[in-house]
């Protein structure tokens, strides 16, 4: 595996006489650009130049001599301004590409890291918006990838089921039941008209609180159904009301007061966040005694840490930039490492149809909800395309492209390779052709070699997703793997009854491609069809 090769290269470099006594940076293996003709490229010499105080090209020249002695390295070369390019032995490629392991071998209990990723967390005051789909795709994919790499990771949806908005929702629903317009500051969506029609008879004697409870529960169930249809299953749906049942906001406030971090002014209780780069201090308890949402958020995050999570990832919508400095200040006040709080802000989604933007307004009635978009193009296309951009990039979601069943559509392109590989396996089985157990002594064609090298980089792509908190590395990898498979399939006849040995080896290669694509799609929450 590449992890072992990396360690072997580091061991050789760190013990080399030419670098003796120097503090050297770790080695980072990356795929070599096609024009180099190599398999692996290192920028190590340029990183080492800072500590060695030498020209990167001189360092690269010295490093190449050392790396050339590493087992399974066929050759190494250098290029300006200090790149190191490595060609691997075919035997290493053939054996390593068959290794299915993703998790590092750790002794039991060694990895104490526990990650909690909170995402979507939309208010239960209306249907889920399209942007929630982007957050869901991002969050759920990361949870799956973390766990695949052996890092314990849970997912959570925070439900704002109490407070003023819940009361306003109840008032708005009651107005609809009575054939009236909701108050100006209430909720005016057509979904409340449909809800009112369902309960008009049964709700004649209801109080406003009962209307509120019914509406909140109805919409929470709607959100849960939408997430399930989107192939997202949260570890826990955490309700804000749970915080108040346990008096956690009050306890969090006492904690801050004891540390001298909360103060009273103008009849309210404040948290001094300006000293931590916030633009103003924040109110925790209003002058009328009502706690703010910020106090509830502090209590909620304290609860996360108290449950044993070591890293808290909050995936937030584009309008939450102001939330980050105050929450970082709160984490610091709770006595936790600021680095343990990882906010990710994803940008908006613009829907494109017929080459034009779809107006995202309630009046247009077009694709306002995630449910409508999912039903129109399918959860697979939504999830893959949402995951294909970095969170900080604005996204144009092309509805026409998402519906295409051609290679222009990246999710179809990748899924089709899985279906083709499955079809090849079925054909071989019908012809009673056996798959090889390994690729020992099998001479690789250039297309086979390229394909196997791409299989090697699967775990590397997953690690990059974790490093950058973005699954786009995986979608890019799968698209490239699919392209390599097409080149292999066009150049190499797989099922050839006259050459059973070659067929056996190529069936094994196809099977490994199928496995990698299936796993990769699974980590993105996308299906891997056996037939298309």
Curated annotation (Swiss-Prot):
It catalyses: tRNA(Arg) + L-arginine + ATP = L-arginyl-tRNA(Arg) + AMP + diphosphate. The keyword Aminoacyl-tRNA synthetase applies. GO terms for molecular function: arginine-tRNA ligase activity; ATP binding. It is found in: Cytoplasm. Its main location: cytoplasm. Belongs to the class-I aminoacyl-tRNA synthetase family. HAMAP family: Arg_tRNA_synth. This is Arginine--tRNA ligase.
């Amino acid at each position: 595996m590449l992890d072992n090769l990396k360690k072997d290269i580091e061991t050789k470099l760190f013990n080399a006489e030419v670098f003796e006594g120097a503090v050297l940076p770790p080695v980072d293996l990356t795929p070599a650009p096609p024009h180099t003709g190599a398999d692996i490229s290192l920028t190590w010499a340029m990183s080492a130049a800072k500590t060695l105080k030498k020209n990167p090209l001189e360092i690269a020249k010295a490093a190449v001599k050392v790396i050339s002695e590493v087992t399974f390295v066929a050759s190494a070369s250098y290029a300006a301004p200090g790149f190191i390019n490595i060609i691997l032995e075919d035997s290493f490629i053939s054996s390593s590409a068959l290794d299915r392991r993703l998790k590092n071998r750790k002794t039991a209990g060694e990895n104490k890291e526990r990650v909690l990723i909170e995402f979507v967390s939309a208010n239960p005051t209306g249907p889920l918006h399209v942007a929630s789909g982007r957050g869901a795709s991002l969050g759920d994919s990361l949870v799956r990838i973390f766990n695949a790499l052996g890092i314990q990771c849970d997912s959570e949806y925070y439900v704002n089921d109490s407070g003023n908005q819940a009361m306003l929702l109840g008032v708005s629903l009651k107005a609809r039941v009575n054939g009236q317009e909701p108050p100006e500051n209430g909720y005016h969506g057509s979904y409340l008209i449909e809800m009112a029609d369902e309960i008009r008879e049964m709700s004649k004697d209801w109080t406003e609180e009962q209307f509120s409870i019914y509406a909140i529960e109805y919409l929470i169930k709607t959100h849960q159904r939408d997430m399930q249809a989107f192939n997202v299953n949260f570890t826990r749906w955490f309700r804000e009301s749970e915080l108040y049942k346990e008096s956690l906001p009050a306890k969090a406030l006492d904690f801050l007061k004891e540390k001298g971090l909360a103060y009273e002014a103008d009849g309210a209780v404040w948290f001094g966040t300006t000293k931590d780069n916030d633009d103003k201090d924040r109110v925790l308890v209003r002058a009328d005694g009502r706690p703010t949402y910020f106090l509830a958020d502090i209590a909620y995050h304290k609860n996360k840490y108290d449950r044993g999570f070591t890293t808290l990832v909050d995936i937030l919508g584009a309008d939450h930039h102001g939330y980050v400095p105050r929450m970082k200040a709160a984490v610091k006040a709770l006595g936790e490492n600021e680095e343990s709080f990882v906010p990710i802000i994803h940008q908006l989604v613009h829907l494109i149809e017929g080459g034009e933007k779809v107006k995202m307004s309630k009046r247009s009635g077009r694709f306002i909800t995630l449910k409508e978009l999912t039903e129109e193009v399918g959860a697979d296309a939504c999830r893959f395309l949402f995951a294909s951009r970095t969170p900080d990039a604005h996204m144009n979601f092309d509805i026409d492209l998402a519906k295409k069943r051609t290679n222009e559509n990246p999710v179809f392109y990748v899924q089709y390779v899985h279906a083709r590989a499955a079809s090849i396996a079925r054909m071989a089985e019908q012809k009673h052709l056996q798959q090889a157990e390994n690729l020992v002594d099998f001479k690789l064609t250039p297309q086979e070699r390229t394909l196997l090298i791409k299989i090697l980089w699967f775990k590397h792509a997953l690690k990059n997703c974790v490093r950058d908190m973005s699954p786009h590395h995986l979608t890019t990898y799968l698209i490239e793997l699919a392209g390599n498979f097409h080149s292999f399939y066009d150049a190499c006849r797989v099922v050839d009854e006259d050459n059973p040995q070659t067929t056996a080896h190529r069936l094994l290669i196809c099977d490994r491609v199928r496995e990698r694509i299936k796993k990769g799609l699974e980590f993105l929450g996308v299906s891997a069809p056996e037939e298309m």
